[in-house]
């Protein structure tokens, strides 16, 4: 029976840190289950891309990295209930033997369920962060070098930068509306 590892992320967007981590994961197990977290979320500043877009990014990036197709992509909608989250994930994915994560809460939740947890190396977390990449997109700063070439091309194909800028503008306008004084109409 092949040894399977679980790796969960939101991938908003897929970046070079994800790929470096996945290269490590692939080197440790026979098959990898890649859980796509917050699968229900899209078109928000924190989660701008749809699940299918994130799946496409992963497929292209893993192919570009030369990683064998020894993986499953599984969407994982949020349940916002940490105490049972690891049980929920276990019910949503094929059998796995080990969990790879850089998130201390994820590590704790799976250890409590008796799983082996390996904290994979983190790569340039200061800039290889989806939050930083989205921020750079909004501010018009260079971001392409932080993601695989195939992901940068895909984001451009779907006009992802324009979407993120629009979401940021909408959020900024909403915040201004919330801070505006309330005017009671005169009758």
Swiss-Prot record:
Q: What is its EC number?
A: 2.7.7.1
Q: List the record's Gene Ontology CC terms alphabetically.
A: cytoplasm
- GO biological process assignments: NAD biosynthetic process
Tell me the keywords, alphabetical order: ATP-binding, Cytoplasm, NAD, Nucleotide-binding, Nucleotidyltransferase, Pyridine nucleotide biosynthesis, Transferase
Task: State one Pfam family annotation.
Answer: CTP_transf_like
Q: Does the keyword Chaperone apply?
A: no
Similarity-based family = Belongs to the archaeal NMN adenylyltransferase family.
| This protein's name | Nicotinamide-nucleotide adenylyltransferase
């Amino acid at each position: 029976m092949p040894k399977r590892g679980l790796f969960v992320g939101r991938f908003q967007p897929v970046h070079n840190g994800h790929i470096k981590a996945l290269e490590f994961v692939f080197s440790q197990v026979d098959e990898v289950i890649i859980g796509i977290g917050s699968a229900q979320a899209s078109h928000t500043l924190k989660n701008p891309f749809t699940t299918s877009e994130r799946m496409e990014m992963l497929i292209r990036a893993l192919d570009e990295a030369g990683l064998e197709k020894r993986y499953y992509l599984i969407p994982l909608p949020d349940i916002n209930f940490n105490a049972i989250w690891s049980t929920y994930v276990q019910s949503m994915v094929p059998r796995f033997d080990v969990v790879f994560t850089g998130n201390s809460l994820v590590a704790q939740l799976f250890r409590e369920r008796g799983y082996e947890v390996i904290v994979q190396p983190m790569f340039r977390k200061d800039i290889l962060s989806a939050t930083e990449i989205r921020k750079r997109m909004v501010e018009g700063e260079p971001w392409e070098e932080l993601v695989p070439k195939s992901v940068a091309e895909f984001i451009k194909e779907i006009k992802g930068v324009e979407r993120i800028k629009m979401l940021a503008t909408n959020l900024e306008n909403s915040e201004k509306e919330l801070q505006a004084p309330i005017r009671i109409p005169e009758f």
